[in-house]
Curated annotation (Swiss-Prot):
Its main location: cytoplasm. The J domain is necessary and sufficient to stimulate DnaK ATPase activity. Zinc center 1 plays an important role in the autonomous, DnaK-independent chaperone activity of DnaJ. Zinc center 2 is essential for interaction with DnaK and for DnaJ activity. Residues 4-68 form the J domain. Zn(2+) 2 binds at C162, C165, C188, C191. Participates actively in the response to hyperosmotic and heat shock by preventing the aggregation of stress-denatured proteins and by disaggregating proteins, also in an autonomous, DnaK-independent fashion. Unfolded proteins bind initially to DnaJ; upon interaction with the DnaJ-bound protein, DnaK hydrolyzes its bound ATP, resulting in the formation of a stable complex. GrpE releases ADP from DnaK; ATP binding to DnaK triggers the release of the substrate protein, thus completing the reaction cycle. One of its GO terms (biological process) is response to heat. The keyword Chaperone applies. It is found in: Cytoplasm. This is Chaperone protein DnaJ. Belongs to the DnaJ family. GO terms for molecular function: ATP binding; heat shock protein binding; unfolded protein binding; zinc ion binding. Zn(2+) 1 binds at C145, C148, C202, C205. It holds the Pfam family DnaJ. The gene is dnaJ.
Length: 373
């Protein structure tokens, strides 16, 4: 399965445009083929470009968050010619790469923090993926503690300002580098970066501000989804911290193999067996489709391996269930290994009419000649 675009850039799903740009510049500078000659660097650079191209476009990003790569299949990848070292930031970017976390960086935010996103893998039957519907799942996620309202403090008390960092959440330390001495900001070891200390912890959540809850959810499956399609359920991830919004739940879909049907894009593939007489004379037979039984016309003289098409009986397009692919049916012709005496006589008469000599190949050779053998 393809890597997640957010993972490729090393950013969270809530990253804003500026965060995406910084991450992209840093990685693109590192793996640009003019700079990095290591094996695999060029492919890595293409992967980074593709991820940034999608995530930097608000509409493409929304489609990707909803449907994964299936939702952005039409977004083209940029080539190397569009990107040069000159476009990737100046000395400040290089400085940040080597000295991230020093005073040139912004101060750590101590306000509301968005909750973590969660992942759930959901298995679907073949027809469920074709037609969509609703599925009920159960998840475990963190919810804001109702006793302390997320503060982590015992009711009637409040967190107090951390005396180590003065509520900033960071402490300073000096460091010497080849470029001189710098002051580095690091996370406060006392409060863990929150800027506050809880003296009387909430008994319900143990001072965490959230508790784990098991919850049932109904997931709407769009028609036409495929293996690896990702659905986003807004607000069903873990609870945020300090009044921050919850994360999202990402449901990854995995379609189970079907004993009768296969999928190729939006087309459905299957095979049928017919007798040699049906192939010679033609007929109409009933075949299985995802919609139920359907009538299929077998033209006279149908050859083994012929592919017949039932139009509009395939997989719906995601987001446009009215538009469907086709059902492609491959015909296998069965040649009997045993026939009755009467059948043999009739076939031998037919062979004489056609001027066929039944030599070494016998009757089987004659039947093979009828089907292009």
């Amino acid at each position: 399965m393809a890597r997640d675009f957010y993972e490729i850039l090393g950013v969270s799903r809530s990253a804003d445009a500026e965060e995406l740009k910084r991450a992209y510049r840093r990685l693109a500078r590192k793996y640009h083929p003019d700079v990095n000659k290591e094996p695999g660097a060029e492919e890595k650079f293409k992967e980074i470009n593709r991820a940034y191209e999608v995530l930097s476009d608000p509409q493409a990003r929304a489609n990707y968050d909803r449907f994964g790569e299936a939702g952005v299949s039409g977004v083209g990848a940029a080539g190397f010619s569009d990107f040069g070292i000159g476009d990737m930031g100046g000395f400040a970017d290089i400085f940040e790469t080597f000295f991230g976390g020093f005073t040139t960086s912004s101060r750590r935010q101590q306000g509301p923090t968005r909750g973590e996103d969660l992942r759930y893998d959901l298995k679907l039957e073949f027809r469920e993926a074709v037609f969509g519907g609703e599925k009920e799942i159960r998840i475990n996620h963190l919810e804001t503690c109702k006793t302390c309202q997320g503060t982590g403090a015992k009711p009637g008390t409040r967190p107090v300002t951390c005396s180590t960092c003065g509520g900033v959440g960071q402490v300073r330390r000096s460091a010497r580098t080849p470029f001189g001495s710098f002051t580095q900001l690091t996370t406060c070891p006392t409060c863990g970066g929150s800027g506050v200390v809880i003296e009387d912890r909430c008994e319900s959540c143990g001072g965490q501000g959230h508790i784990q809850v098991s919850k049932k959810l109904k997931i709407t499956i769009p028609a036409g989804v495929d293996n690896g399609t990702r659905l986003r359920v807004s607000g069903e991830g873990d609870a945020g911290l300090r009044g921050g919004p919850p994360g999202d739940l990402y449901v990854y879909l995995f379609v189970q193999p079907d004993p009768e049907f296969q999928r190729e894009g939006n087309n459905i593939l299957s095979r049928i067996k017919i007798s040699y007489l049906q192939a010679i004379l033609g007929c109409r037979i009933s075949v299985s489709t995802v919609d139920g039984e359907a009538e299929l016309k077998i033209p006279a003289g149908t050859q083994p391996g012929t592919v017949l098409v039932l139009e509009g009986r395939g997989v719906p397009r995601v987001g446009n269930p009215v538009a469907r692919g086709d059902h492609l049916i491959t015909v296998d012709v069965e040649i009997p290994t045993h026939i009755t005496h009467e059948e043999r006589e009739l076939l031998e008469k037919l062979a004489k009419i056609r001027g066929e000599r039944l030599g070494k190949g016998g009757l089987e050779g004659f039947l093979g000649s009828l089907f292009g053998g």
